[in-house]
Amino acid sequence: MVNFTVDQIRAIMDKKANIRNMSVIAHVDHGKSTLTDSLVCKAGIIASARAGETRFTDTRKDEQERCITIKSTAISLFYELSENDLNFIKQSKDGAGFLINLIDSPGHVDFSSEVTAALRVTDGALVVVDCVSGVCVQTETVLRQAIAERIKPVLMMNKMDRALLELQLEPEELYQTFQRIVENVNVIISTYGEGESGPMGNIMIDPVLGTVGFGSGLHGWAFTLKQFAEMYVAKFAAKGEGQLGPAERAKKVEDMMKKLWGDRYFDPANGKFSKSATSPEGKKLPRTFCQLILDPIFKVFDAIMNFKKEETAKLIEKLDIKLDSEDKDKEGKPLLKAVMRRWLPAGDALLQMITIHLPSPVTAQKYRCELLYEGPPDDEAAMGIKSCDPKGPLMMYISKMVPTSDKGRFYAFGRVFSGLVSTGLKVRIMGPNYTPGKKEDLYLKPIQRTILMMGRYVEPIEDVPCGNIVGLVGVDQFLVKTGTITTFEHAHNMRVMKFSVSPVVRVAVEAKNPADLPKLVEGLKRLAKSDPMVQCIIEESGEHIIAGAGELHLEICLKDLEEDHACIPIKKSDPVVSYRETVSEESNVLCLSKSPNKHNRLYMKARPFPDGLAEDIDKGEVSARQELKQRARYLAEKYEWDVAEARKIWCFGPDGTGPNILTDITKGVQYLNEIKDSVVAGFQWATKEGALCEENMRGVRFDVHDVTLHADAIHRGGGQIIPTARRCLYASVLTAQPRLMEPIYLVEIQCPEQVVGGIYGVLNRKRGHVFEESQVAGTPMFVVKAYLPVNESFGFTADLRSNTGGQAFPQCVFDHWQILPGDPFDNSSRPSQVVAETRKRKGLKEIPALDNFLDKL
């Protein structure tokens, strides 16, 4: 089993230049877990015979059954580079042994919050792409997240065995396929990255540099251009140059790699490389990549799969492959696996690519610090993170909770960015709502134990220095999902993670047996801990609601709740979609509300946001924490706001960060600042529970036009102003043509050409519309992209499969909010049905009349 001890790992942990923290990310079913296996078996944790079948990192029973990864799992590997390979590393290094902390993450879009949590604690990412289906929606989503977190990508083209055996591609076609995938990935990187002048420099991937791997995870073989360049350099050197020193050799190999990709051709007649596709004699020359790399692979496949015994024996001898005695008698696919695995072992190729091209914590924390840390860029904590200093103050980010074997307890899983964490150390545990100088969300407690995560096992360890990934015992009572752990008194929080999906699907749950209610509540608390994304809400009516990213996500959550967290039988409602409320025009009257004691008056109007502003707020381009003038300039330039008004934004809401704005455009009002807090509180309340059906508001700008206040402070307290502000906000919404917004999924469907018609049928029935259709070049597959309301998406997958004979594979991602056409006050319209259903579910009466909110002078 594990062939190195905890002490050995601990010794390397101090060599922070030799640590690599990386995650494996990709579209669903592109083979992350299978590839991870070949890495794990190389580092001596699975017996190599079973690699490719165990999916070691799929630790849960349901992951093994469904063949999907649900939770991201961490594992530490140890790899030693040979002296020759060390010369390829361009950053600082310390000895030949490397510690690789690898996190296998799920590819299914419903679990992309798990990916976000994994990305936060790593510095590099291995992006896996299936070379048959190419770059998909989820590849793009995850890669975009990685680049936003300043994580350096390397690419792996997986499933080459399929390209050769199923699609039967020619070498040139295969080269074009690879070329296209590399281009697609680079387009995504350059779109979302910061360019070459940014702090990370150039992070584009390029086969010539060795940042692209090719291979097959299932068969356990892989290579980068470096492997072949080394073979050829050795071959040419054998012809008479004598021995090369390691550094010269590295230089030669790098030159060779440049010749093996792109428009470079090889003339087999005289063994020379040329840049033109025709030889001096006018013969058409083969591309070097096809001739020197793909051709030998094709020959091996051809000889073995067509049972050509003599040819196979010749090739094995020529390639110098040593087979075990039991492998010699195999034929067909088993022999192919054995030969390829011996000739181009996947573990070596990938681990070399990871150690050579991904950054160590020392390199990465320099440019990631400003994204990770909220405090000033020059305090002790920030300096400790930037220099990755084990003697600095402890700064550690907990990105998620991992359930232990013992019910209801969790390991806190995270990464040490600065300092040293050890068993028994007294630390400050800061939740996401902590603000420096306040007591809220802060605990001072000792750490009970520090442990090392090993896939399905944990190993106790004394202490862990910065740059490493670690689990803590005994912190789980004080944190819900994420948080910062530090020993520095004036430390600010590490920045909260931004999820690329939002929980839009909800289910109400109740215990079948009412006596089990306390267990259900306890179970919901544990569920909220164990999943970074899920929200557990208790409605005013006493309902327990679970909100998740989609059907599959909710299904897994409910199963966990029933079996692991609450351990009781549960009844669940049908899934319900959350809506948002908005307005479509400016209020047609200036709305006035008087306070209950009739001494104060507020005048307001509401109007809709310009297109794109709500999305900017969601992304954090415009936020409450920004510098005032900078924000005003942005709004004025991009959305043509009046600069004076843009400077007087009071707040965002709901929760102080949401996509609604309260601006003050009053002129010369007395005592205005004294009631500001009360109006803001009313605004937060109103935007959280809108006028139509108490859903959140979105994309509404409220303007305070005028305020008349009583001169005596006692008559304008919070009790007078807050409800008045809320009534006034409601009135201004109801007079501004209110509308409902529904969430929309972006659906990507992969299917053969002949079933495209069936897809259109299903989408039209479900109010979806197709906006792009393209053929995947070099394959008979079509990709259809469509928008589909989340409300209609339940059972969509099953419906689609039955209409296309199971040949279409849909993938849904939450994309945007869209206005539901129709007036909520017109009884025959769709929005009015939704409003009625929602109000009935929440136990509310019908929409109150405008007169309840609007007062006469």
From Swiss-Prot:
The keyword Protein transport does not apply. GO terms for biological process: positive regulation of translation; translational elongation. There is a cross-link at K239 (Glycyl lysine isopeptide (Lys-Gly) (interchain with G-Cter in SUMO1)). InterPro entries: EFG_II, EFG_III/V, EFG_V-like, EFTu-like_2, G_TR_CS, P-loop_NTPase, Ribosomal_Su5_D2-typ_SF, Ribsml_uS5_D2-typ_fold_subgr. The modification N6-succinyllysine is found at K152, K272, K572. It is an enzyme of class 3 (hydrolase). GO terms for molecular function: GTP binding; GTPase activity; ribosome binding; translation elongation factor activity. The modification N6,N6,N6-trimethyllysine is found at K525. Belongs to the GTP-binding elongation factor family. EF-G/EF-2 subfamily. This is Elongation factor 2.
